[in-house]
Amino acid sequence: MWFPPWIIFSLFHTCLSIDLTYHIEEERSPGTYVADIAADSKLLDNIKSAEQQMVTFSQLKRKVTQYFNVTKTGKLYTSQKLDAESLCTYNKECSRIIKIVVRKTKSFTKILKIKIVIKDINDHAPEFPEKQIILQFGEGDREGMKKSVPNAIDKDISYQNSFIEYKLKKSDDSFSLSVSKRADGISSLKIVLKDKLDREIKDKYNLEVIAKDGGSPSKQSVLNVVIVVEDENDNPPVFSKPLYNISIRTTHDKTKPILTLSVTDKDIGSNSKITFHFSPKTSSQAK
């Protein structure tokens, strides 16, 4: 198809520059008004009012046309709900370019290049991969021992809305939260032991890690961290009495017990299993 030189120049100029730029928030309902291209382009300013009705606006058929609709009078609307997360990538300007053909009667006048910036809204809260995790710390673990916990992900694409701040919901004397950034910008979370644990005093701790994004208003989620204290064999068996005094007759039946010992051990599992034997200092007669 042949075009006059002035049309070719106009097309070339259009490819190099943006004529109009508009902004609209994502998730607006289909049919949301965006702008009046006819008024903003000022193309009708030099046309007599009686002839302005002859000027029409239409959109060049491209893939992006499915998102927007332009009326003959130059009004721009959305044709469907726009989701920034599905249309664009993280921390990049989310925009689409449409080209509007302006005609007077049937003759070609100009092509306008319109840029529509889709603004990310804070419609996603940070999400942990799980609602709850279980960590194990031992009684023998020293101060500074760390255990990793999963980080949260925010699906919003703007830096502010996807920025996540972490903290423990309540301060704890035994544990703290360490947050550092990896080379890829992802946060690395660790639960840090602040003081030696004693399972016999407390065998379980419940912590809540809060992930809060930078949106306004902000959104947040909670990761429940259950910390189970593993037993260490740090308690000896204890007899109910430090000394047992008994008397037996010489005629006592050897098959019958002369004493029942009571022993307890504060440890659990195999650490609390008790066996009995005579001390090497016990005389053979007593045995």
State what each model feature region is:
Residues 1-287:
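Extracellular cadherin-type adhesion modules in metazoan precursor proteins
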